[in-house]
Design a protein with these regions (language model features):
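Formylglycine-dependent sulfatase
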Residues: 2, 16-146
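Sec-dependent N-terminal signal peptides
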Residues: 4-13
């Protein structure tokens, strides 16, 4: 599946037109959008001729767009856990949503990896880092990591 690489496609956009306008005491707003199964050209500013995304296109014009990224896992929960923890999948232990023991045990081809359904409380996460820097955080939508 070609879009698997882009499961953790995200945009980090600063809300001001020109980051050089910040004084040393000002901090930029950060909008981190993490989208599951977003294709490389599914957004207007990335060249989509099918989908219309005018508001995201405007954000992209005013901010910073990252176009070179790495998906640390082949599905949503472990990728999200890696993004928020900074750890690779074997380090945080979130391999899938729910149990990895799916389907009929007799016909299963692989031994399921032991899976955690959440990040350990001891893991220092990106939202905690941002909070310590004075940011207010919010999460909307899917979570699946604790």
């Amino acid at each position: 599946m070609k879009n698997i690489f882009f499961i953790v496609s995200f945009l980090l956009i600063f809300s001001c037109n020109n980051p050089s306008h910040f004084s040393k005491s000002e901090t930029p707003n950060i909008l981190l959008i993490n989208v599951d199964d977003l294709g490389w050209k599914d957004l207007g500013f990335m060249g989509s001729q099918y989908y219309e995304t005018p508001f995201l296109d405007e954000f992209a014009k005013q901010g910073i767009v990252f176009t070179n990224a790495y998906a640390s896992a082949a599905n949503c929960a472990p990728s999200r856990a890696s993004l928020f923890s900074g750890l690779n999948t074997p380090r945080h232990g979130v391999y899938t949503v729910g149990s990895a023991e799916r389907g009929d045990k007799r016909t299963r081809k692989l031994i399921p990896a032991k899976n955690k359904k959440y990040l350990n409380d001891s893991i220092y996460t990106l939202p905690e880092l941002l909070k310590s820097a004075g940011y207010i955080n919010a999460n909307f939508g899917k979570w699946h990591i604790g």
